[in-house]
Each structure stands twice: as structure tokens, then as C-alpha cells.
């Protein structure tokens, strides 16, 4: 059964309840991404050196527990090499950021799983959406493991987490978010928009490049590469830095992940490519009189333009927390608009779908 036919099974108020639930989960994920960004920017991500999915829900409640948590932090290289002499009060500040980030992860897990099980029990979700929503849950469980895998990279030899693992962690969170946004749009059962195949191709390319750009941005963040080369449009004194500076590490591919100049340069070049592609897509959609797809393309181009301005300001000011978080927040908006644009251009044609019989609200199945 196709997605649109499947959504025929979900009549109000059933479909409304499912969409409200998924909207809340998507909003929580967006908040968690921003809290994660603040945790990184405040260098708080390694303040909790243990992984306790259940018992770690409660923070330290007594002086003895606080001192024990602080002593645990003192055993890792970040404290010894960067924060030696930190007071307990200062430790509490970074602890609360990381604890809040982990708590949000637990809240999201509960906010997703419990209503999902209830909807399944009530027969509110058909077979196709069951598979999709179980898949999203599996990605969420994987994300918890990836989060600890990331933190573990900074507990023994490094003074920070691996930028590659950080990028994987962020990108997986955004893939989960995008999957929920896509599902929400499909459940809305919007009429399809007739459009040329080239519009679909450029929309899909925009979505793929947006995810790649978010991954590259996470590499910049993980390396603190936004705190160097704080000029624009020049970088390292040129529009295109010398090959010797871009590719000095061996083997060559390490520069893509470890070289501050190369990582920031890649992020800039991808931003230019995304902006140009979004402009082309918007012009094409408007000229094609693509209706809702034209307005969607214009909104996406506007968001990418704002994102570009915020990115430039963030670099010029050496990554202040406020600008960096605004840049990350608008990145989530860009991703949302890119997902919606692809979905509206690739939605199945309703006329080709068999009509399913509505199921009464109280009847399972």
C-alpha cells in the first residue's frame, strides 16, 4: 500500500493525534541539537565520564556526589591539560550542560516510544507507517550508542571528542529529524504538485548537499576551525589557498578531517555551491509556475541566504556562542525546508491510488 493510501486509514482525530505526537518529537530533537551545540561551544561535553543510561538520569544531589563526579572529570586529559585548577563551581557549570543534553535524549526516547506503543495498541498506525516509525526508533537507539562512542573518544588520549564522531553524531540526529518531518508531511496527505523532473532532481540534490554541509559544519565545530582564518571572502589570504597549505598532511585524505584550513575551506565552498543551486532551483520553479513548489523553493533560498550571512558573521567574529547557535538553528530550518520541498515534489499521485476504507477511531487495526 502506498503512503497516501496508507494515510487514508488515518482519519481525524486519529491522524491529528499522530501528527501532534511527531511534531512534539521533532521539536524536542531540534532543541536537543541546539543544546548539544551549546554543550560543545562551552566545552562541556566531557564533564560526565560515565555512561549510565538509567541511574545517570539523576544529577549529583549531595556534596559527596558532586565531589565524586568532579574527581572523575579530573582523571581525563581535558582537565589535566586544559582545565587544571578548575573549581567545583566551574565544574558544575559545564556538568549541567552535558547532563541536560543527556536528559533530553532520555526524554525524547520516552516521548517517542510510549505514544508509539499506545498508537500501535489502538490500531492507529497502518503497516507501512509501522515499519517507518520502528525504523526511526531504531535510529534513535543507535544515536544513543553513537553519543557515547563520541564521548569515549575524548576520555583517554584527546582533550576533546573526535570531530569525525561529533559529525556522525550530529548528522544522525538530523537524519532522524528529517525522517520525522518527511513522515509528518506524508501524513498531511497534501495533493501532489505537477512539476518537471529537473525540479525534483535539483530538490533532491539540495537535500543531499544540505546534509553533507551540516556534516562539514560539524567538522568545523569539532576542530574549532571557526576560530581561525577569521576573514571573508579571503581565507588564509586568498580566495583559494595554496595546495601546499590545503594538502600538507599525509595521506592526503586526512586533510579533509584534520586540517583546519581544508575543513573550513570545504565548508565555505559547499555553502557557495548550495546557495547557487538553491537560486537556480528557485528561478526554475518560479518560471515553471510550479505553484506550491515555487513558494517552497523561494523560502528555501531565503533561508539559505540568511544562513550564509550568519556563517560569514560567525567566522568574522571567531565563533561567539550566540552567533554560532543562531547559525546552527537556521541550519535546522534549511534542512526542514529542503525535506518539505523534496516531499512535495515527489508525493505520489492520488488518482493512481486505490481508496482505502476509513477505520472507526475506536476500532483496532
Curated annotation (Swiss-Prot):
* EC number of this enzyme: 1.17.99.9
Any one of the GO BP annotations: heme A biosynthetic process
Q: How does it sit in the membrane?
A: Multi-pass membrane protein
Residues spanning the membrane: 17-37, 107-127, 132-152, 164-184, 203-223, 264-283, 296-316, 320-340
Enzyme kind, highest EC tier: oxidoreductase
Annotated heme binding lies at 267, 327
Q: Enumerate the GO terms in the molecular function aspect.
A: metal ion binding; oxidoreductase activity, acting on NAD(P)H, heme protein as acceptor
Q: Which InterPro entries match?
A: COX15/CtaA_fam, HemeA_Synthase_type2
Superkingdom assignment: Bacteria
Q: Which reaction does it catalyse?
A: Fe(II)-heme o + 2 A + H2O = Fe(II)-heme a + 2 AH2
Q: Which UniProt keywords apply?
A: Cell membrane, Heme biosynthesis, Iron, Membrane, Metal-binding, Oxidoreductase, Transmembrane, Transmembrane helix
Functional pathway: Porphyrin-containing compound metabolism; heme A biosynthesis; heme A from heme O: step 1/1
Q: Which Pfam families match?
A: COX15-CtaA (PF02628)
Cellular compartment(s): Cell membrane
Cofactor(s) needed, names only, are: heme b
Alphabetical GO CC annotations of the entry are: plasma membrane
Q: Which PANTHER family match?
A: CYTOCHROME C OXIDASE ASSEMBLY PROTEIN COX15, CYTOCHROME C OXIDASE ASSEMBLY PROTEIN COX15 HOMOLOG
So what family is this one in?
Belongs to the COX15/CtaA family. Type 2 subfamily.
**How does this protein assemble?**
Interacts with CtaB.
| Role according to the record | Catalyzes the conversion of heme O to heme A by two successive hydroxylations of the methyl group at C8. The first hydroxylation forms heme I, the second hydroxylation results in an unstable dihydroxymethyl group, which spontaneously dehydrates, resulting in the formyl group of heme A.
Instruction: Name the chain's protein.
Output: Heme A synthase
* Gene this chain is encoded by: ctaA
Amino acid at each position: 500500500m502506498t503512503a497516501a493510501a496508507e494515510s487514508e486509514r488515518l482519519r481525524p482525530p486519529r491522524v491529528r493525534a499522530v501528527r501532534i505526537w511527531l511534531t512534539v518529537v521533532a521539536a524536542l530533537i531540534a532543541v536537543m541539537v541546539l543544546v548539544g551545540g551549546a554543550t560543545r561551544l562551552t566545552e562541556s561535553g566531557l564533564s560526565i565520564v560515565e555512561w549510565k543510561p538509567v541511574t545517570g538520569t539523576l544529577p549529583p544531589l549531595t556534596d559527596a556526589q558532586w565531589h565524586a563526579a568532579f574527581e572523575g572529570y579530573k582523571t581525563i586529559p581535558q582537565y589535566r591539560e586544559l582545565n587544571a585548577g578548575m573549581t567545583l563551581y566551574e565544574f558544575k557549570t559545564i556538568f549541567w550542560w552535558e547532563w541536560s543534553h543527556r536528559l533530553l535524549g532520555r526524554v525524547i526516547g520516552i516521548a517517542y516510544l510510549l505514544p508509539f506503543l499506545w498508537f500501535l495498541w489502538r490500531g492507529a498506525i497502518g503497516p507501512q507507517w509501522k515499519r517507518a516509525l520502528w525504523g526511526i526508533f531504531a535510529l534513535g537507539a543507535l544515536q544513543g550508542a553513537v553519543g557515547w562512542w563520541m564521548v569515549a573518544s575524548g576520555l583517554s588520549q584527546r582533550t576533546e571528542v573526535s570531530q569525525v564522531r561529533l559529525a556522525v553524531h550530529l548528522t544522525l540526529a538530523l537524519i532522524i529529524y528529517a525522517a520525522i518531518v518527511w513522515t509528518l508531511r506524508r501524513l498531511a496527505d497534501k495533493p501532489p504538485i505537477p512539476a518537471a523532473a529537473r525540479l525534483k532532481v535539483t530538490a533532491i540534490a539540495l537535500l543531499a548537499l544540505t546534509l553533507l554541509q551540516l556534516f562539514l559544519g560539524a567538522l568545523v565545530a569539532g576542530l574549532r576551525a571557526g576560530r581561525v582564518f577569521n576573514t571573508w571572502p579571503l581565507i588564509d589570504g586568498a580566495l583559494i589557498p595554496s595546495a601546499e597549505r590545503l594538502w600538507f598532511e599525509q595521506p592526503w585524505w586526512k586533510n579533509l578531517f584534520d586540517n583546519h584550513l581544508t575543513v573550513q575551506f570545504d565548508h565555505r565552498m559547499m555553502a557557495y555551491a548550495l546557495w547557487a543551486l538553491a537560486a537556480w532551483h528557485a528561478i526554475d520553479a518560479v518560471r515553471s509556475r510550479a505553484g506550491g513548489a515555487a513558494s517552497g523553493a523561494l523560502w528555501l533560498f531565503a533561508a539559505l541566504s540568511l544562513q550564509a550571512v550568519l556563517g560569514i558573521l560567525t567566522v568574522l567574529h571567531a565563533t561567539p556562542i550566540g552567533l554560532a547557535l543562531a547559525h546552527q538553528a537556521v541550519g535546522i530550518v534549511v534542512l526542514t525546508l529542503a525535506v518539505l520541498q523534496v516531499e512535495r515534489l515527489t508525493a505520489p499521485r492520488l488518482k493512481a491510488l486505490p481508496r482505502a476504507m476509513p477505520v472507526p477511531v475506536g476500532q483496532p487495526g
